[in-house]
Swiss-Prot record:
Binding site for FMN: 88-93, 143-146, 182-191, 217
Annotated source species: Vigna radiata var. radiata (Mung bean)
Entry protein name: NADPH--cytochrome P450 reductase
Cofactor(s) required for function per UniProt: FAD; FMN
Binding annotation for FAD: 468-471, 486-488, 502-505, 690
UniProt keyword Lipid metabolism, yes or no: no
Membrane topology: Single-pass membrane protein
EC nos: 1.6.2.4
Keywords for this protein: Endoplasmic reticulum, FAD, Flavoprotein, FMN, Glycoprotein, Membrane, NADP, Oxidoreductase, Transmembrane, Transmembrane helix
Subcellular location: Endoplasmic reticulum membrane
Molecular function GO labels: flavin adenine dinucleotide binding; FMN binding; NADP binding; NADPH-hemoprotein reductase activity
Post-translational modification: Glycosylated.
Lumenal side stretches: 1-25
Domain FAD-binding FR-type: 289-535
């Protein structure tokens, strides 16, 4: 047993104080007791910290562009500030914005170029006007999605800019601008956002530099962007060249192929990122950049065994998180590429999938590599993880990716890659890549000598894997701890004979729920708010049109109405037009829908079966059968909701609505168009389409 003096020395050492040479037993007791209390407190705090580390926190998904926190960056004397804004859904608009920035910097020494995510431009709506007044030359890269809506990171700016125009009047006389829109001509509201912003800028006093560019992703949006860029240079020469060299011809510009610096790490020092673990980041809300990893609680097949297709019902468990949602919202899901795709890509790259590495935007000496694109993942991880979670491997590659591949091809025959990426190879690219739906992996397999280093592959060839969005098929009143998803499996042959498997739907098809195994599947998710909402007044009639998985948000609506009715709320009439092929194969949620009718939350269920009778019957045919009743409900102030395929079903339903208005109101086509337009403007004709 230690002597008192030894114990005193130990206590002194622990407390970091001197107790003197003569210490009484009572003082020693106090000191040792204090030490014990301190030790106990430290152990308690460590344990609490350890427990807290298990709490659900956001997964950090790095942003392509990190905006400076400080205010306006000073522009050097003699320089002209050029700001390029982007609003992107899949990263294409952002890529175009950065490509434009690099070319402007290369062509014009006096240009001080900055690329800005519209969502980061102003922390508060009140700052938009103040900041825009300081701009002189701007460009907007704006994508349109769904039913002519702005994408997430441009929605706040778009709402502010278009809704407050009357108050501001003409105030942008000092601003010169250009707009390039990204859309798909197959959709009804082709490039609506780009067109509207272009028109509004002019109406609010700004000077249009060139005509709005209309990128069509149904063809070659890269060619559209290149053509629009070419129209810029003669105009920018007047603004960004000095008088003495205004007439000189610019040196032909060749875009540099971006590349990250790769650092190899010891695989035994596995990073937490390799497990895609949750990481604290200070955010109190989850969003596209800070999703939350949650478990799959339930997964089941909705089609009957007789069906040759598949539709999955999946439930994410959000208990213990701060995730909340409203009926009608969307959920974004970060899924993973399947093992088969990852293995094949690893072989094509000639790399070990267990390679543990990180990507960096600076050189060994700390200087910048020149690009502004941050790595697609935030820390060291294995190549297997990087390919599974962060690389888009199954979409057709862009032309810029083919050019990057070509620079690392060793076989003369692989020179074809350069041709495909060139203006001369436009038709061949459209046919061989886009028309044949060749994925990046397929293209790499066709040109096996092209083995780019990982720094080039992740910077210039494989885009970041984007989240997939689904209409939530539940109501928080009915399922507050769950987010339900209804997902059709994407599976089928491409023109090349390859079987295309949708990334997220395949993941959901193979997901293991917690009700079947503790080792269940999980995914990072976030909620995207939607304006697809039930009327605030629950007595207002509603008409819902949603064949197939278009039923998803209406299942949430009906759960909501079920809960409201159980609480004694008086409900207005509700009609649901649903469509499927055959009641014996793909009549999803059949029992639930019938129970909603029995309980009274659904007034009438009208189903169109397209493969049962001699003639195909679709929801629009059933709408015409019920034209008088349908229009009567709308005339009483009712709401019409449509969900599903934008290119086919939603367009047909829209035309049917026009026909119903003409017939029931006895008006011509122009007047019917005006009536339908007013329904949309009043928020009584809502569409959730893709």
């Amino acid at each position: 047993m230690a002597s008192n003096s030894d114990l005193v020395r130990a206590v002194e050492s622990f407390l970091g104080v001197s107790l003197g040479d003569s210490v009484s037993d009572s003082l020693l007791l106090i000191a040792t007791t204090s030490a014990a209390v301190v030790v106990g407190l430290l152990v308690f705090l460590w344990k609490k910290s350890s427990d807290r580390s298990k709490e659900v926190k956001p997964v950090v998904v790095p942003r392509d562009l990190m905006m400076e926190e400080e205010e306006e960056v000073d522009v050097a004397a003699g320089k002209t500030k050029v700001t390029i804004f982007f609003g992107t859904q899949t990263g294409t608009a952002e890529g175009f914005a950065k490509a434009l920035a690099e070319e402007i910097k290369a062509r014009y020494e006096k240009a001080a170029v900055k690329v800005v995510d519209l969502d980061d431009y102003a922390a508060d709506d009140d700052l938009y006007e103040e900041k825009l007044k300081k701009e002189s030359l701007v460009f907007f890269m704006l994508a349109t999605y769904g039913d002519g809506e702005p994408i997430d990171n441009a929605a706040r700016f778009y709402k502010w800019f278009t809704e407050g125009k009357d108050e501001r009047g003409i105030w942008l006389q000092k601003l010169t601008y250009g707009v390039f829109g990204l859309g798909n001509r197959q959709y009804e509201h082709f490039n609506k956002i780009g067109k509207v912003v272009d028109e509004e800028l002019a109406e609010q006093g700004a000077k249009r530099l060139v005509a709005v560019g209309l990128g069509d992703d149904d063809q070659s949006i890269e060619d559209d962007f290149s053509a629009w860029k070419e129209s810029l240079w003669s105009e920018l020469d007047q603004l960004l060249r000095d008088e003495d060299d205004a007439n000189t011809v610019s040196t032909p510009y060749t875009a540099a192929i971006l590349e990250y610096r790769v650092v190899i790490h010891d695989p035994t020092a596995a990073s937490t990122y390799d497990n895609h673990s949750t990481v604290a980041n200070g955010n109190t809300e989850f969003d596209i950049h800070h999703p939350c990893r949650v478990n799959v609680a339930v997964q089941k097949e909705l089609h009957k065994p007789e069906s040759d297709r598949s539709c999955i019902h999946l439930e994410f468990d959000i208990s213990g998180t701060s995730i909340t949602y409203d009926t009608g919202d969307h959920v974004g899901v970060y899924a993973e590429n399947c093992n088969e795709t990852v293995e094949e890509t690893g072989k094509l790259l000639g790399q070990n999938l267990d390679l543990f590495f990180s990507l960096h935007t600076d050189k060994d000496d700390g200087t910048s590599l020149g690009g502004s694109l941050l790595p697609p993942f935030p820390g060291p991880c294995s190549l297997r993880t990087a390919l599974a979670r962060y690389a888009d491997l199954l979409n057709p590659p862009r032309k810029a990716a083919l050019l990057a591949l070509a620079t690392h091809a060793s076989e003369p025959s692989d020179e074809r890659l350069k041709f495909l990426s060139s203006p001369q190879g436009k038709d061949e690219y459209s046919k061989w890549v886009v028309g044949s739906q060749r994925s990046l992996v397929e293209v790499m397999a066709e040109f096996p000598s092209a083995k780019p280093p990982l720094g080039v592959f992740f910077a210039a060839i494989a885009p970041r894997l984007q989240p997939r969005y689904y209409s939530i098929s539940s109501s928080p009143r009915f399922a507050p701890q769950r987010v339900h998803v209804t997902c059709a499996l994407v599976y089928g042959p491409t023109p090349t004979g390859r079987i295309h498997k949708g990334v997220c739907s395949t993941w959901m098809k193979n997901a293991i729920p917690s009700e079947k195994s503790q080792d269940c599947s999980s995914a990072p998710i976030f909620i995207r708010p939607s304006n697809f909402k039930l009327p605030v007044d629950h007595s207002i009639p509603i008409i819902m049109v949603g064949p197939g998985t278009g039923l998803a948000p209406f299942r949430g609506f009906l759960q909501e109405r079920y809960a409201l009715k159980e609480d004694g709320v008086q409900l207005g009439p509700a009609l649901l037009f649903f469509g499927c092929r055959n009641r014996q194969m793909d009549f999803i949620y059949e029992d639930e829908l019938k129970s909603f009718v029995e309980q009274g939350s659904l007034s009438e269920l009208i189903v169109a079966f397209s493969r049962e009778g001699a003639e195909k019957e679709y929801v629009q045919h059933k709408m015409m059968d019920k034209a008088a009743h349908l229009w009567s409900l709308i005339s009483q102030g009712g709401y019409l909701y449509v969900c599903g395929d934008a290119k086919g079903m939603a367009r047909d339903v829209h035309r049917t609505l026009h026909s119903i208005v003409q017939e029931q109101e006895n008006v011509d086509s122009t007047k019917a168009e005006a009536i339908v337009k007013k329904l949309q403007m009043d928020g009584r004709y809502l569409r959730d389409v893709w």
